[in-house]
């Protein structure tokens, strides 16, 4: 409750300051223009993230993953869940044992079984989700190495052994999906490529076998992507 009229005004002012871009969003662009605006935001996000990534962090991540007996990818919410699945798709093609999980109970069960020989990769656009932070702390208590793809300076980033940092990418145009998820996808693509190039001959053979298995199964032109 409010103590008096002054307190009421103060609380109303504080409430209006939270999510103000949703109370007074930017004007609607012309329909022919917002397509270009979305593309422009994606391009800007990719350039921003590429310039913010550190090659040494990817080298450290490759070193951890190369020694892992098992890799687990955790993510909650929309883009973060999808990106943890994307990690599984990318890494399994290279022969890495990996499983993705989004359910908070299953993540907790998994975290309790981890140790120094397993690696946990955690995807989060915010680095703030309480359930995700809890399971990462649990995994750390058993000395499991943590790779985080998340906002720099977030609580999740502070828990990571290796950080692949994301950067804020929100605009005042609230009606489109966040462009930040493209930064996470870029991090995953860079990591997967670094892993592939770490053992190029072995991975060439794995990819050849996948291509052969898919061509026998579905056919199609040689230029089709692997694994779709």
PLM segments and residue spans:
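HTH-adjacent hinge/linker in prokaryotic transcriptional regulators
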Residues: 1-57
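Hydrophobic/basic alpha-helical segments enriched in Actinobacteria
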Residues: 12, 31-34, 158-163, 214-217
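Internal, active-site/partner-interface "lid" segment
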Residues: 197-228
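Glycine-rich phosphate-binding loops that contact phosphosugars or nucleotide phosphates
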Residues: 66-186, 192-198
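Electropositive phosphate-/nucleotide-binding environments in soluble metabolic enzymes
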Residues: 2, 36, 40-43, 52-55, ...
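Short acidic/histidine-centered micro-motifs embedded in hydrophobic/aromatic stretches
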Residues: 11, 64, 210-213
């Amino acid at each position: 409750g409010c103590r008096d009229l002054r307190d009421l005004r103060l609380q109303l002012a504080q409430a209006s300051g939270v999510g103000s871009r949703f109370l007074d969003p930017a004007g609607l662009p012309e329909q022919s223009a917002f397509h270009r605006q979305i593309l422009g935001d994606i391009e800007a996000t990719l350039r921003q993230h590429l310039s913010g990534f550190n090659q040494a962090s990817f080298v450290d991540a490759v070193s951890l993953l190369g020694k892992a007996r098992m890799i687990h990818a955790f993510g909650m919410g929309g883009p973060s869940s999808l990106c943890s699945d994307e990690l599984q798709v990318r890494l399994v093609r290279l022969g890495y044992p990996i499983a993705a999980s989004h359910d908070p109970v299953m993540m907790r069960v998994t975290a309790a079984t981890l140790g120094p020989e397993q690696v946990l990769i955690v995807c989060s656009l915010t680095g703030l989700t309480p359930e995700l932070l809890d399971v990462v702390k649990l995994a750390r208590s058993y000395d499991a190495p943590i790779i985080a793809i998340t906002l720099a300076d977030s609580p999740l980033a502070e828990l990571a052994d290796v950080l692949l940092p994301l950067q804020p990418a929100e605009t005042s145009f609230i009606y489109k999906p966040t462009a930040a998820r493209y930064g996470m996808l870029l991090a995953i693509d860079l990591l997967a490529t670094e892993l592939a190039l770490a053992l190029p001959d072995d991975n060439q053979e794995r990819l050849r076998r996948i291509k052969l298995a898919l061509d026998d199964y579905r056919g199609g032109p040689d230029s089709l992507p692997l694994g779709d």
